[in-house]
């Protein structure tokens, strides 16, 4: 174990609350084209193209810039949703969970579920803008919203497209997804990392340990979150008629069968796998170098 790892094991270090959001922004900048293709696939009518066909179509019709449609909204989402859920989870771990129980899922799961719920609610408005901006170019010209950026999107939705009701469209499935994502992504990362270190003798300070644990966490998170993710995309991309989530679900099951809830699993994992690896890698690097922390804490 490295000197830094030994020191960390010996005392309860309180890292800055914004590490999760900063790491999320970094991961988003890299994986945004994959997320864009995933959203387009989830909203597209049948028959659906493959992930790579969708990326090829976006590149051919919209150019390289098109691959980053809605990037400002995606960054805003990380500043809200990811910052809140990671920050709240770490805060609860530091102040609520007994030190000897930091790898006990009976303690971790409730903390992660609460953190995911408030993160999903806090980031809902950014999620609505994000999904609409990503899918805008795929719509007919007359139906496009043409938001200039995330702030313009928030303003236009609030001013002209239904106000807060529209900005919080889909908040219930988004909170459910936040709960599922945080529980399946953050908790499983902690559990897998602990298992690799204590059972398989991985070095807790090494990048390969972090990347292995995060890859496994991404696999679990994609599978657990797929149904809520598909529902969230369809609700938030709606035209504003505010149909109940259960009606949208029933219509989709009737027309497409129950398997629609896992539609886009592969593109979701193709995006969420690398995203999860990058976000935890970035968090571990921020912690390793104590970025933004007072000198006496370094």
Swiss-Prot record:
One of its GO terms (cellular component) is mitochondrial inner membrane. Solcar repeats lie at residues 11-95, 103-195, 205-289. Mitochondrial dicarboxylic transporter catalyzing the exchange of dicarboxylic acids like malate and succinate for inorganic phosphate. Required for growth on ethanol and acetate. This is Mitochondrial dicarboxylate transporter. Signal peptide: none annotated. The chain crosses the membrane at residues 17-37, 58-76, 105-126, 170-189, 211-231, 265-283. It is found in: Mitochondrion inner membrane. It is a multi-pass membrane protein. One of its GO terms (molecular function) is thiosulfate transmembrane transporter activity. Keywords: Antiport, Membrane, Mitochondrion, Mitochondrion inner membrane, Phosphate transport, Repeat, Transmembrane, Transmembrane helix, Transport. One of its GO terms (biological process) is sulfate transmembrane transport. Belongs to the mitochondrial carrier (TC 2.A.29) family. Its main location: mitochondrion. Present with 3390 molecules/cell in log phase SD medium. The C-terminal Solcar repeat is required for association with the TIM22 translocation complex during import.
């Amino acid at each position: 174990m490295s000197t830094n790892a030994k020191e960390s094991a010996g005392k309860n270090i309180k890292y800055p609350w914004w590490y999760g959001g900063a790491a999320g922004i970094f991961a988003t900048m890299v994986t945004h084209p994959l997320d864009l293709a995933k959203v387009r696939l989830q909203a597209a009518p049948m028959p659906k193209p493959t992930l790579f066909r969708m990326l090829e179509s976006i590149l051919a019709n919209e150019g390289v810039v098109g691959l980053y449609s809605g990037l400002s909204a995606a960054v805003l989402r990380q500043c809200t949703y990811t910052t809140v859920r990671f920050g709240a989870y770490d805060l609860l771990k530091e102040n609520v969970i007994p030190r000897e129980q930091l790898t006990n899922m009976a303690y971790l799961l409730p903390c992660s579920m609460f953190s995911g719920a408030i993160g999903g609610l806090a980031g809902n408005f950014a999620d609505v803008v994000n999904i609409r901006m990503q899918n805008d170019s795929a719509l007919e010209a007359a139906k496009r919203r043409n938001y200039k950026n995330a702030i313009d999107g928030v303003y236009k939705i609030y001013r002209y497209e239904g106000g807060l009701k529209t900005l919080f469209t889909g908040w219930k499935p988004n909170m459910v997804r936040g709960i599922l994502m945080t529980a399946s992504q953050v908790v499983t990362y902690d559990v897998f990392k602990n298992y690799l270190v204590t059972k398989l003798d991985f070095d807790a300070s090494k990048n390969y340990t972090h990347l292995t644990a995060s890859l496994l966490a991404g696999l679990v998170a994609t599978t657990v979150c797929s149904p809520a993710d598909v529902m969230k995309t369809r609700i938030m991309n709606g035209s504003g008629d505010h149909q109940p989530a259960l009606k949208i679900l029933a219509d989709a099951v009737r027309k497409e069968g129950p398997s629609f809830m896992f539609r886009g699993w592969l593109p979701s994992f193709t995006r969420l796998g690398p995203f999860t690896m990058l976000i935890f890698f970035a968090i571990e690097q921020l912690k390793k170098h104590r970025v933004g922390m007072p000198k006496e804490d370094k």
